[in-house]
A protein has these predicted regions:
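Long, well-structured alpha-helical subdomains associated
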Residues: 137-159
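Post-HExxH zinc-binding segment in Zn-dependent metallohydrolases
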Residues: 104-144
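A short, surface-exposed helix-loop junction/capping segment
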Residues: 1-10, 89, 95
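Auxiliary, metal-adjacent structural segments of Zn-dependent hydrolase domains
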Residues: 8-58, 128
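Short alpha-helix carrying the canonical HExxH Zn2+-binding catalytic motif
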Residues: 79-94
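Active-site scaffold of zinc-dependent metalloenzymes
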Residues: 46-79, 97
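Conserved small/polar residues in nucleotide/adenosyl-binding loops
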Residues: 159-169
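Catalytic Zn2+-binding segment of zinc metalloproteases
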Residues: 90-111
Length: 169
């Protein structure tokens, strides 16, 4: 509804400040410039956030759905879950903007071993999809970095073909 949209749009300055503050901290830690990447907000119902690297016609940006991160929605994310979401997307930024050691490039995919390695550096939950409370759990990154993805809903790439998910929940 338009009332909710207006309330959520009024929150964007707060979210922007929260995200930039976190990304500036991570940038200092890693020598990167993620806090300078444009941040946009929308009303996506099927994704919480995204990082677009900026190839071809795509502009580099972070994008977050106010329907998930907003304070005035029915079931807002906790601060810990919001921070984990922001780190999740920053880990995608890291994949494109820093050298990943070869030993962490064995598993292809958007949430493959390189992304998991980036998660391990910043304390993001190495889970491809949002799960409430994942950001609070102490993750065994060594184990996660060596484990193949077994979730059949995640696209996997092999040398001969591309397998896409057949069902989405």
């Amino acid at each position: 509804d338009n009332n909710l949209r207006q309330l959520l749009e009024n929150e964007t300055k707060i979210h922007l400040a929260e995200i930039r503050f976190l990304y500036q901290k991570l940038d200092r830690q890693l020598g990167l410039n993620g806090a300078r990447v444009p941040i946009t907000f929308g009303f996506d119902t099927d994704r919480l956030g995204a990082y677009t690297p900026g190839f071809g016609q795509d502009e580099e940006e972070f994008h977050f759905s106010l329907l998930f991160i907003g304070y005035c929605v029915t079931k807002p994310l906790s601060k810990d879950d919001r921070m984990d979401l922001y780190k999740h997307e920053y880990a995608h930024y890291m994949q494109y903007n820093m050298d990943i050691p070869d030993k962490y490039n064995w598993q292809p995919g958007i949430h493959g071993s390189a992304w998991k390695y980036c998660c391990s550096l910043i304390g993001a939950a190495p889970t491809p999809y949002y799960k409430a409370g994942e950001g609070l759990i102490k993750h065994d990154y060594d184990k996660v970095l060596k484990k193949k993805i077994t979730d059949k809903s995640i696209p996997t790439v092999s040398y001969t073909h591309l397998t896409l998910p057949t069902n989405r929940e």
